Amino acid sequence: MSLPAYDALLQPDAALVVAFSGGLDSTVLLHQLRGWQQQHPQSRLRALHVHHGLSPNADRWATHCQTVCEQWQLPCDVLRVTVDGRENGIEAAARSARYQALSAALEPGDILLTGQHLDDQCETVLLALKRGSGPAGLAAMPLTRMLGANPLLRPLLNQPRQSLEAYAVTHQLVWIDDESNQDLRYDRNFLRQRLLPELYQRWPHFAEATARSAALCSEQEQLLDELLAGQLAELIQADGSLCFPPLMIMSELRANALLRRWIAGQGGGMPSRDALKRIRDEVMASREDAQPRLRFGQAELRRYRQQLYWLPLFRSLRDIELSWPDLRQPLDLPQNLGTLHASSSQSLLRYPQPDEQVSVRFHAQGHVHLAGRNGGREMKKLWQELQIPPWQRERLPLIFYNQTLICVPNLFVTHAGAARDRQGWQIIWDRASREGEQ
């Protein structure tokens, strides 16, 4: 790729961040962007190296990247990650950890650039074929996408590896080779070492043709996105859940297309045909009083009444009890659920007695008598009346004085906790993330 081509992709004052592994692709990319940045001094350029810790050479690679960046007078940060491949395999786990680390290291306005090239695109399409993917999977890697709130750009995607090698030799670049790239147990390496050389020898432009097919699949998916956007918007509720009864009376093809797009929009990727069938049979078609759930990696699909919810997996808080000895200090809740703090702006709760300890729990059972109501009711019935989904019930902070339930902030005050003669206070729950509500 020549330098002028970057002008069509980047603004002169762009803040650029290169995912720099030290391999051929990212070395060429960083070198080219260094030249572009010198022509656009108002722009900024830095590198991020992800240290996976999987190879005995990982420390040496990190040092190499830092040395190259010092020579080129570019900032370089090393991001250390832990890779757990027990669930989805080392390749997928390393990729997930890498992108999470890169995303967390980006600042507002940064553009992340990665070095995938034409041969990588060809491999991605063939792997999608091997998995039996549909058009969305066969569309492979887009030139640009969002990584959280930041753009991710692949400027070398139409360049064959051979041209990158020629560029590196011409400019006397030094790069590292990951020994794991020779391990044929990994599918991508098998394609790269065994299959693709044969295909390229028979059909020299096989990679270009594959990329064209991927682009056509991408266009078809974009068209479907446009055609289904209005109907999908009608089904998605304010909390992000999906109203599913209309899906049950439309064609399976249309229903599956809408489900796929909703799940992808929730960050769940594109589900397989088998996964969609399980959603229909085990979740949508289950009896009305059931509480079906399907796990997908680190998320799960659940149903409550007429809605589907895509939820992150959380550790149970059922047995957690937090002491709140000093009500003048805010109390941070676990798992990013926010903060509790006391306020005298309203007299909703009575003050605790000297012998009453204030605590926060996430589970209660038995009868509860709400302030201003006659008689009590079972907690389960109360949650149903308040339309609180089952998974949220143990993620709401319950305020206790000793063993007596006093209130759930923002929801209700019990008879035992109600203020008398306008002498009292209130507890305010500042939610750090709506994630805790789901």
Language model feature labels by segment:
Residues 1-197, 226:
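Core alpha/beta nucleotide-donor-binding catalytic domains of modification enzymes
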Residues 130, 200, 263-267:
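Hydrophobic/aromatic-lined pockets within catalytic cores
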Residues 2-24, 43, 81-83, 97, ...:
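AMP-forming adenylation/ATP pyrophosphatase catalytic core
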Residues 193-194, 198-210:
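Conserved anion/nucleotide-ligand pocket segment
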Residues 75, 174, 205, 269-270, ...:
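Short coil/loop linkers at secondary-structure junctions
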